[in-house]
Amino acid sequence: MVQFDVEKTLEELTLGEKVALTAGTDFWHTAAVPRLNIPSLRMSDGPNGVRGTRFFNGTRAACFPCSTALGATWDTELLYEVGRLMAEESIAKGSHIILGPTINTQRSPLGGRGFESFAEDGVLSGLLAGNYCKGLQDKGVAATLKHFVCNDQEHERLAVDSIVTMRAMREIYLMPFHLAMRLCKTACVMTAYNKINGTHVSENKQIITDILRKEWGWDGLVMSDWFGTYSTSDAINAGLDLEMPGPTRWRGTALAHAVSSNKAFEYVLDERVRNVLNLHNFVEPLGIPENAPEEALNRPEDQALLRRAAAESVVLMKNEDNILPLKKEKSILVIGPNAKTAAYCGGGSASLDAYYTVAPFDGVKAKSEGEVSFSQGVYSYNELPVLGPLLKTEEGEKGFKFRVYNEPSSNPNRELLDELRLENSLGFLMDYKHPKVTSFLFYADMEGYFTPEEDGIYDFGVTVQGTGKLYIDGELVVDNSKNQRQGTAFFGNATVEEKGSKELKAGQTYKVVVEFGSAPTSDLDMRGVVVFGPGGFRFGAARRVGQEELISKAAELASQADQVVIFAGLTSEWETEGHDRDHMDLPAGSDEMISRVLDANPNAVVVIQSGTPVTMPWAHKTKALLQAWFGGNECGNGIADVLYGDVNPSAKLPLSFPVRLQDNPSYLNFRSERGRVLYGEDVYVGYRYYEKVDLAPLFPFGHGLSYTTFSRSDLSLATVPEKRQLEDGEPITATVTVTNTGDVAGAEVVQLWIVPPPTGVNRPVRELKGFAKVFLNPGESKTVEIVVEKKLATSWWDEQREKWASEKGTYKVLVTGTGDEVLKSSFEVEKTRFWLGL
C-alpha cells in the first residue's frame, strides 16, 4: 500500500471506479482499483474480539470481557491497553478496520445487544470508548464507533422508527459518541439500522452531515451496518460513504444512473470517495497486504491482560460478615449451571471462537488447596447443549465428520466434495466456500459416535437455517425438515429447536448422523429477515433429569459443605444480537435453586454471569454476591482471583439493576408497536429516572464494594474566569484526597456528580460528569484530580434555540465512591450562555 494524493486520484478515477469504491465486495472487504494501485481493505468484528473473516471454522481469537464488563472497571487506562491489544489482534487477522466499539445506551435491560455497550451513562461510556479507540488507533488500526444512533433494541431493528426528542437525543443517546470524539476522532462511524423520527439513519442528513460532520468537525468514513442501506441517492446525499456488505444492492449501476440523472451530483459522489481514499491513507502505515493470512497470537502477556480485565470487571455487590474472600485451604462445593460452562461472550456479531476458555469451576479448582466438589443444581440452557465435543470420529478423534455434497442423501451416486473434522456442532455457514459448491444450495452429512456415561432417556435437538434430520443408529429421532417454525438463531434466520428422544445405555456407542440441507431447502417465510449466507446448523443433546432431583441434591450437599459458591446467570443463548429478552428473569429453575441452597447454607456465595441486569428475588437472603458479566477467555480465572482475594474487587456497576422489570423507565415503551418505538422516558434513562422519582433500584448505578475501606477528604474546586463565548478552556478542576484505610491493597473509583440549580426545565437530580480510578496500598493516600469543562458540566439541550444552554446559577458538586461518604462543594455560572460543537 502507498499513500495517495487524494485529489489527484479522484481526478484519475472513472465514474464506474468511483461507484465501485462506495460499496463492499463481500462481507469484509472494500473494492480495489488495480489500475490505480488502490487495494482492498479488510474489516472485522468487533465488539469483544477480532474474529477475522470467517464465522465458520475460522482462526481462533482472543475474547475480551464484554463491554458492560469493561464498563464496570471504570478504568480508562485499562481500556486504552485493551484497545492496543485489540489492534494487535486485528493486525494478526490482516484487518485494517475494527467494527467497534458499540456505544449505544441501554434504555432497557431487555435489549439483546445491551452487553455490547459500556454503560447507561454517556460520560462513563464516552470516556471509556474514547480511550479504547485511542489504543486502537495509536497502533494504526481504524476504530468504528457504532451504531450511530438509537440502535437500542433488536425487535424490528431494520424497520423500527425511534421517536425521540432532540433533547434526549443530545443529552443521552449522542453523548457517548460526542465525548468519545473529543478524545479520539475515530477513522470510521457505522450508522444504525433504525429510523429516527421518520428517516433511516443511513439516509439521515441531519444526523450524518449536520451533526457528525459539520457540528462536530469530523472527517472520517461513514459506513452502513450490514444490509442497513435502504436507498441510493438519498443515502449518498445524506453522507453515507460506504455500503456494507457487498455485493452492492444500492450502488453499482443504480448509483451510476443516479449520478447521470443528477439525483446525486458527481461532486457529492466525490465527497464519498474522498473519505474512502482518506481511510486508505489512515491505515496505510500498517503495511497489511491485500488478502493477508489470518494468524493467532495467544501470547502469555495477552492472557495476563485478559485475566486482569476479567478480574477488574467483577462487581462485589454484597459481602455481609466478610464472607469473602474464601479460604483456599478449606474444601469447597461448586454449584450451578454456569460453573462448568464458560459464559465468555454474548451472541451474534460479538461471538467468536476463542483461543481457549476457562470455566468458573476450573478457575476455582486451580486456586483451591482443599477438595473441590460439584453439583449441577439446575440446567439453564435455552437449547440443548451442543453435542459435538462429546462425539468421536470413526478414527477416534474428538468431534465429527462434516461431508459436503451438491445432492441430497436420496441420491446414491452423489459426489463427495469436501470433508472436514469439526468439534463444535454449532456452525454458521455464512462464509463457507468450496470450488465445487457454486450456489447457496448444497447438502452436508455430519457423522460422529456418542458413548453416554449414564443410562437414561436422552433428548436430542436440531436447529437449522435450512433443513435437518438427526438419526441414532439409523433411527430418525428428530425431523426438522418440514412444517418448520421460525426461531431466533443465526440472526433470526433459523428454525426453533425441534426435539426428539431416545433411551440410551451407559458405555454403549451410538452412531449419530445429521443430514443437513442449506438455506434454500427451508420452507420458512424469510420476508423481513436479513438472510446471512447459505445456512447454519446446531445439534445438541442432554440426559433427561428432573430439576427437583438436581435442586434437592445441591441443597443437601450445601448444608454439609464448608464453603459453597453458586454460579448462575445467562449465556450467549439468552443474550444475543437478533432478538431481545422477553423478561429479566434467570432461566427456569435457577431462582428456586439459588433460594433453596441459601436456605440450606446461608453463607453460600452467589456469582451471576450476565451482560445486563437480571432479577434476584433471593438477593435479601445472600450474604455475598458477585456480578461477573461475560468475562472473555479468562472469565473463570478472573472470577476465582476475586473469590479468593488474589484480586481485590474494584468494579462499579455501569447499569442500574432494578428490582423488577416494571421499575425500568422504558417498561411501557420498549419494542416496536406498529413500526415505531416511543422513547417516552425522554432524558430519564437509568439512574436519572430512579433518582428523579425516588424509586430505589435493587443495586444502583455506580455501586460496588471492596475488601478494603477508603476515605475521601479535602475536596477543593478550581475554576477560571468566564469568557464571553462558552467554549473549551473553562475547566473545573476538582481535587480530593483518597486514603486506603483498610488492610488490603485496592482501587477506588472517585465519582464526580453535578447537581443543577432550579431552572425553567426539568433536569435530573444529579448527573455523572467525571471519574477517576486510583490504586492504593494499605494506609496510602493520593490526591486525585478530575477535570471537567464547564460547558459539559452544566449544559442541557435547548430545543427552541437548537443549542446547548449553560444557565446562570449555583451548581453543586458531589464526590462519591465506595461507601456512603459524600463530599460537597459548589461553583457559579455567572451568566447564561449557549453553544454548539464538540
UniProtKB/Swiss-Prot annotation:
Q: Which organism is it from?
A: Aspergillus clavatus (strain ATCC 1007 / CBS 513.65 / DSM 816 / NCTC 3887 / NRRL 1 / QM 1276 / 107)
Q: Name one GO molecular function term.
A: beta-glucosidase activity
This chain's function reads: Beta-glucosidases are one of a number of cellulolytic enzymes involved in the degradation of cellulosic biomass. Catalyzes the last step releasing glucose from the inhibitory cellobiose.
Pathway assigned to this chain's UniProt record: Glycan metabolism; cellulose degradation
What InterPro entries does the entry give? Cellulose_deg_GH3, Fn3-like, Glyco_hydro_3_AS, Glyco_hydro_3_C, Glyco_hydro_3_C_sf, Glyco_hydro_3_N, Glyco_hydro_3_N_sf, Glycoside_hydrolase_SF
SMART domains linked to this entry: Fn3_like, PA14
Q: What is this protein called?
A: Probable beta-glucosidase I
The keyword Glycoprotein belongs to this UniProt entry's keyword annotation: yes
Residue ranges of the PA14 domain? 395-555
Record's keyword annotation contains Lyase: no
Q: Which residues are glycosylated?
A: N57, N197, N493
User: Could you mention a single GO BP entry for this protein?
Assistant: cellulose catabolic process
The record's subcellular location field reads:
Secreted
What are its E.C. numbers? 3.2.1.21
- The residues annotated as the active site are D225
> Gene3D superfamilies annotated for this entry?
Galactose-binding domain-like, Glycoside hydrolase family 3 C-terminal domain, Glycoside hydrolase, family 3, N-terminal domain, Immunoglobulins
Q: Which family does it belong to?
A: Belongs to the glycosyl hydrolase 3 family.
Alphabetical GO CC annotations of the entry are: extracellular region
Q: Which UniProt keywords apply?
A: Carbohydrate metabolism, Cellulose degradation, Glycoprotein, Glycosidase, Hydrolase, Polysaccharide degradation, Secreted
The reaction(s) catalysed by this protein are: Hydrolysis of terminal, non-reducing beta-D-glucosyl residues with release of beta-D-glucose
